[in-house]
Amino acid sequence: MGKRGQKPKGKVKIKWSPNFAYAIGLLVTDGNLSTDGYHVSFTSKDFELIANFLKSLQINCHIGRKANGSNPSEKKYFVAQFGDILFYKFLLSIGLTPNKTKTISVINVPNRYFFDFLRGHFDGDGSFYSYWDKRWRSSFMHYLQFVSASEKHILWMRTELLKKTGCVGHISKSKNSSVYQLRYAKRESLKILKKMYYTNTVLCLSRKKDKINKALNSRY
């Protein structure tokens, strides 16, 4: 009988935790699963987000640079890529796929880590904006927004947030856009933000957190 080959060793420790769930959120928005069934990559303009991704998975790997399609000579993006067949298969098992942009749907995240996942999703593709509405005296408006090119995924997120917070939100899609927007205003946004940033030490993209704090501290 021939010798059995060694079982593959995983680079990533597959165990749910706040940081691990945060990394899954990042991968859902800006990650990529190669069609080779082995390589996983994460791309961002923010080097801090690349560092957060690697920290959350407790790994080190080479960080490269790449350009976008419109300007191939300007390499604005950082890319972290590594090979791990066990982690790759795990990602498939929870709902990620290669070429996921428009096909992604439900992501199987444990309830206790959902808001860590959501914070990663927000840091990857979400936004927060605020302004004073000139139509009304002392009317300070602020919105929390999540986006996805997959209608099924954005509907799943809305359903989960409704179950977990009672927040209804609103889904919209511009006529000339391929992206769905899930938006929460004022009280609903505050409720979700408190759950996303439940301590001052949670792993997050500092510039987004600082923007939120600056806006809300000026009003509340």
Can you name each region flagged by the protein language model?
Residues M1-Y220:
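Internal intein/HINT superfamily modules and their associated LAGLIDADG
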